[in-house]
């Protein structure tokens, strides 16, 4: 495995400004939207002809073509008009929720056919065959009003944002970004509890997913895939930042976490989406679309490999997805990455879908990260193969005038709308790396724009820190799936915001206070903090994001540990919470019994020592001396009955 760093764009010093004359819509989206407009124009024209020259039945049909359900009102069935409007709303939800792209046209066509069939039939409260001619101009008025309202909303949002461009560019020219926080915080008891929970979750039977939240798998916060993603990312950060010199146990845990992503319960949702949205019965979760699974898993594996150096998932067939009828779809890190690259190339929009027909910015950022991270750890160039087109799509199809990006866009008709998943349907950056690896200049611009709102808020919170604590009683907030509230979620935002502005004092205070105020005292399968599984994963990510955050880990790739390492011990009996070499010569080690109030006699096997050199292992009432063997290895026996903080160093000559 190789580790490389792409320095492309890293040296740029000029700020990335916003376009002074931004387009209202990108070229590909414009073409898709024009196709929709032509189709609607033909549809309305046919409806108008039927109204003008047709029989009563055809007039009813044509009236519904002008406005869904209006034909029912024309034939004096107002109740069915209301039913149609409700059906249109349901179809709209299904269009977005399960990619039922046919739902709205089907309801529209059904309302027209139904009105025609009832044209000469009985009525509820009026005479048989009654028609209300005034409905025809009302249908046209309704169509014009609806289309006009849509255009007005889009145009007013565009003009409002475009008016900000001169001010924003002036700000960007002089904006300064705070240095990232890179100092490592020593793990405390809550870190130990969180790590213990992660191990307990990972090492349950491989078909076990106890500890996750269960619910629908299409949208919301109960998707198993995203819960697994966040937990694995967090564990990767812990491995890289706190256990680089004791990789054995956490590497096995992370390998198990990746394998759990192949559990059928995690990805079986795709069969229904692919069938409904693509009319494709193939359940393979990697082959086509579904970037919300393939790209996220690719990025997860990147992080695991960068943190631990494992090459397990580079082996052919190391990722096996077994469908309910026994069909097996075999992949590995390389073929998974190739599938993501291939999907980018086949997409006419440049971004490819999560749910069929819907391409989300965040998911496609994750797709770019999946390619970039693979390139770093394997020395390939998959990201550079798609980078230019990908960036063009980002800048010309998704960018809005104020520097934010549309959350979602249709691959079929080019429209973007607010799904309610993110505030306002836009954001300055997204993905776990927020452009830092794939497009550093974009990352700097996004961070500068985010700081305009975040810096004053974080400054006010920072002034409230006393004695290393932030004494706030924050109200619980709804989790993303809206089935429960969490006291931890507001703290995640504060810690993330404090990292954004580079306020280490506020970060430490929020980490300390959040643990004190949100602790439950419970262990797996319950959670040690008041949060959902996704919320817990997000919290661990922001808690463990120094000195390396996820972007830094991706850009660094895997680096062999320097200095002494803890090669092996009784991992089931002892919890190692820290193993780092601050100077390349010594080893700082923290460990405690896996079981509370237990005293365990263990052996610590050390490696990468200097052959024949005398060492001491001391701290927390312990003192051991030994000489490293010719192979640079040594073993020490000791009793662990409490938290021990030890330092292994070369013995000082008397």
What name fits each language-model region?
Residues 191-199, 232, 247-265, 294-305, ...:
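Hydrophobic core segments within long, regular secondary-structure runs in both alpha-
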Residues 199-219, 259-284, 337-358, 395-418, ...:
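Glycine- and aromatic-rich loop/turn segments at beta-sheet edges
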Residues 223-239, 289-305, 359-375, 416-435, ...:
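Well-ordered alpha-helical segments within folded domains of soluble proteins
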Residues 292, 321, 327-331, 335, ...:
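Extended ligand-binding clefts on enzyme/binding-domain cores
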Residues 176-279, 499, 503-506:
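Long, contiguous N-terminal structural blocks used for assembly/anchoring
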Residues 236-358:
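Extended ligand-binding groove/face enriched in aromatic
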Residues 618-636:
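Solvent-exposed beta-strand/loop surfaces of large extracellular or lumenal domains
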Residues 5-208, 303, 307-311, 425-614, ...:
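Terminal, non-catalytic domain-edge segments
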């Amino acid at each position: 495995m190789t580790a490389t760093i792409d320095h492309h764009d890293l040296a740029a010093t000029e700020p990335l400004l916003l376009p002074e004359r931004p387009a209202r819509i990108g070229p590909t989206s414009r073409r898709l939207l024009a196709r929709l407009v032509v189709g609607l124009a033909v549809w309305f024209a046919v409806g108008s002809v039927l109204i003008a020259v047709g029989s009563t039945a055809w007039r009813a049909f044509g009236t519904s073509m002008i406005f869904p359900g209006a034909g029912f009102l024309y034939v004096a069935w107002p109740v069915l008009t209301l039913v149609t409007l409700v059906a249109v709303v349901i179809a709209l939800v299904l269009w977005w929720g399960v990619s039922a792209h046919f739902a709205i046209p089907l309801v529209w066509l059904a309302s027209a056919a139904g009105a025609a069939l009832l044209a000469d039939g009985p009525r509820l409260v009026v005479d048989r065959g009654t028609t209300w001619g005034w409905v025809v101009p009302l249908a046209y008025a309704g169509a014009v009003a609806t289309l006009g309202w849509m255009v007005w909303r889009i145009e007013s949002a565009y003009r409002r944002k475009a008016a900000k461009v001169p001010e924003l560019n002036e700000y960007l020219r002089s904006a300064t970004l705070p240095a990232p926080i890179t100092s490592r915080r020593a793990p405390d008891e809550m870190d130990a509890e969180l790590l213990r929970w992660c191990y307990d979750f990972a090492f349950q039977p491989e078909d076990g997913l106890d500890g996750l939240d269960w619910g629908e798998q299409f949208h919301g916060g109960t998707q198993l895939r995203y819960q697994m993603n966040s937990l694995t990312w967090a564990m990767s950060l812990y491995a890289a930042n706190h256990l680089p010199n004791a990789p054995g146990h956490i590497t096995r845990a992370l390998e198990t976490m990746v394998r759990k992503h192949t559990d059928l319960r995690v990805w079986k949702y795709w069969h229904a989406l692919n069938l409904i949205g693509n009319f494709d019965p193939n359940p393979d979760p990697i082959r086509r679309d579904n970037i919300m699974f393939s790209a996220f898993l690719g990025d997860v594996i990147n992080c695991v490999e960068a943190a631990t150096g494992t090459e397990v998932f580079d082996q052919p067939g190391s990722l096996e997805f077994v469908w309910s009828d026994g069909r097996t779809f075999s992949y590995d890190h390389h073929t998974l990455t190739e599938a993501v690259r291939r999907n980018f190339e086949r997409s006419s929009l440049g971004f490819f879908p999560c749910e069929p027909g819907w391409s989300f910015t965040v998911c496609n950022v994750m797709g770019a990260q999946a390619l970039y991270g693979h390139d770093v750890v394997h020395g390939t160039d998959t990201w550079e193969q798609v980078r230019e087109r990908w960036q063009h799509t980002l800048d010309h199809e998704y960018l809005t005038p104020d520097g934010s990006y549309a959350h979602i866009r249709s691959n079929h008709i080019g429209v973007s709308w607010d799904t309610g998943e993110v505030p306002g349907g836009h954001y300055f950056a997204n993905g776990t790396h927020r452009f830092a690896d794939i497009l550093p200049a974009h990352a700097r611009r996004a961070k500068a724009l985010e700081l305009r709102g975040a810096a004053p808020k974080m400054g006010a919170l920072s002034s409230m820190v006393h004695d290393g604590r932030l004494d706030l009683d924050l109200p619980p907030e709804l989790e993303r799936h809206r089935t429960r509230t969490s006291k931890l979620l507001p703290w995640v935002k504060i810690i993330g915001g404090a990292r954004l502005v580079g306020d280490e004092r506020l970060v430490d205070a929020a980490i300390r206070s959040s643990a004190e105020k949100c602790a439950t005292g419970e262990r797996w399968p319950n959670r040690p903090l008041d949060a959902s599984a996704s919320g817990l994963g997000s919290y661990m990510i922001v808690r463990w994001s120094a000195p390396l955050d996820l972007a830094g880990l991706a850009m660094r790739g895997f680096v062999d540990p320097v200095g002494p390492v803890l090669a092996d011990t009784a991992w089931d009996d002892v919890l190692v919470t820290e193993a780092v070499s601050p100077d390349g010569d010594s080893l700082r080690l923290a460990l405690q019994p896996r079981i509370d109030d237990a005293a365990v006699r263990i052996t610590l096997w050390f490696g990468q020592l200097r052959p024949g050199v005398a060492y001491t292992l001391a701290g927390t009432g312990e003192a051991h001396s030994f000489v490293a063997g010719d192979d640079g290895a040594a073993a020490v026996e000791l009793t662990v009955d409490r938290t021990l903080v030890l330092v292994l160093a070369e013995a000082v000559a008397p």
